[in-house]
Every structure is written in C-alpha cells, then in structure tokens.
Amino acid sequence: MSQKTVKVQLVRSLIGTREDHRATVRGLGLRRLNSVSELQDTPAVRGMINKVSYLVKVLA
C-alpha cells in the first residue's frame, strides 16, 4: 500500500516572521516563495503545516 502524500506551497514571505516558524518552513522543505514540497501525510507534518498555516497553502 502506498503512503499518502501532501503537497505544500510557500505563498507568503518569511520576512518578519518568528525564527521558529522559519525553521518549521525549512523543515517542510520549502526554500523560496512559491516553492512546492511533497511530503508524507503524517501527524507530525500536519502539525508543522498547522503551525505555519498563514504562510503555506496545501495543494493536495
């Protein structure tokens, strides 16, 4: 059975954000504005997305 995945896109700039939020975005594999990362859909990843939900958009 294949793992479920989720695609995340960085849609807002990291300028002026908290340092731990920047680290969370880097942990999601996002570097530049509009970059997309495909990750396994786990509770840890969901928590990271929830923490920086004002910066990212979930695509799938």
Curated annotation (Swiss-Prot):
GO terms for biological process: translation. GO terms for molecular function: structural constituent of ribosome. CDD domains: Ribosomal_L30. Pfam families: Ribosomal_L30 (PF00327). GO terms for cellular component: cytosolic large ribosomal subunit. InterPro entries: Ribo_uL30_ferredoxin-like_sf, Ribosomal_uL30_bac-type, Ribosomal_uL30_ferredoxin-like. Keywords: Ribonucleoprotein, Ribosomal protein. It comes from the Bacteria. NCBIfam families: rpmD_bact (TIGR01308). Belongs to the universal ribosomal protein uL30 family. This is Large ribosomal subunit protein uL30. It comes from Cupriavidus metallidurans (strain ATCC 43123 / DSM 2839 / NBRC 102507 / CH34). The lineage of its organism: Bacteria, Pseudomonadati, Pseudomonadota, Betaproteobacteria, Burkholderiales.
